[in-house]
UniProtKB/Swiss-Prot annotation:
PROSITE patterns linked: RIBOSOMAL_L15 (PS00475)
Ribonucleoprotein among keywords: yes
UniProt GO cellular component terms: cytosolic large ribosomal subunit
The protein's assembly and partners: Part of the 50S ribosomal subunit.
Assigned protein family: Belongs to the universal ribosomal protein uL15 family.
HAMAP family xrefs: Ribosomal_uL15
Alphabetized PANTHER family for the sequence: 50S RIBOSOMAL PROTEIN L15, LARGE RIBOSOMAL SUBUNIT PROTEIN UL15M
Protein role: Binds to the 23S rRNA.
Annotated protein name in UniProt: Large ribosomal subunit protein uL15
Record Pfam families: Ribosomal_L27A (PF00828)
UniProt keyword list: Ribonucleoprotein, Ribosomal protein, RNA-binding, rRNA-binding
Length: 146
């Protein structure tokens, strides 16, 4: 077999749907658009959310809440994910970004307490949950708020 002899597997590629090319093709005449009406016209159709003139759902439902522009955006990481590091490693946000465990965040790193930690680590972060701090210290590690 040569490169120019390669062909896709039988039935793996569908042929293009050629519409409006005569009645014999099976997709002639109305070209799959049914009879007359807005949806049969070129460029026809209604915008998203339009309900035929009835007040649409997105306008019937009341507005609620707001976005707090002062909300802190932390990168969050559970303690169980720190088990990949060797004993005695100093965990910093920079190290975690380098290892692609977190993305760079606006307001720093927050360590959450889900899972178990078996390694003795020094963890530096902006915030820790109570459970996370307890688990790090129980494993013989240190918690440092930066």
């Amino acid at each position: 077999m040569k490169l120019h002899e390669l062909k896709p597997a039988e039935g793996s590629r569908k042929s293009r749907k050629r519409i409006g090319r005569g009645t014999g093709s099976g997709l002639g005449r109305n070209a799959g658009k049914g009879e007359k009406g807005q949806k049969a016209r070129a460029g026809g159709g209604v915008r998203i959310g339009f309900e035929g003139g009835q007040m649409p759902l997105y306008r019937r439902v009341p507005k609620r809440g707001f976005t707090n522009i002062f909300a802190k955006q932390y990168s969050e990481l559970n303690v169980e994910r720190l088990n990949i590091f060797e004993d005695g490693t100093e965990i910093t946000p920079e190290l975690l970004i380098e290892k692609r465990m977190i993305r760079k965040s606006k307001d720093g790193l927050k360590i959450l307490g889900n899972g178990e930690l078996q390694k003795k680590l020094t963890v530096k972060a902006v915030k820790f949950t109570k459970a996370a701090a307890q688990k790090i210290e129980a494993a013989g590690g240190k918690v440092e708020v930066i």
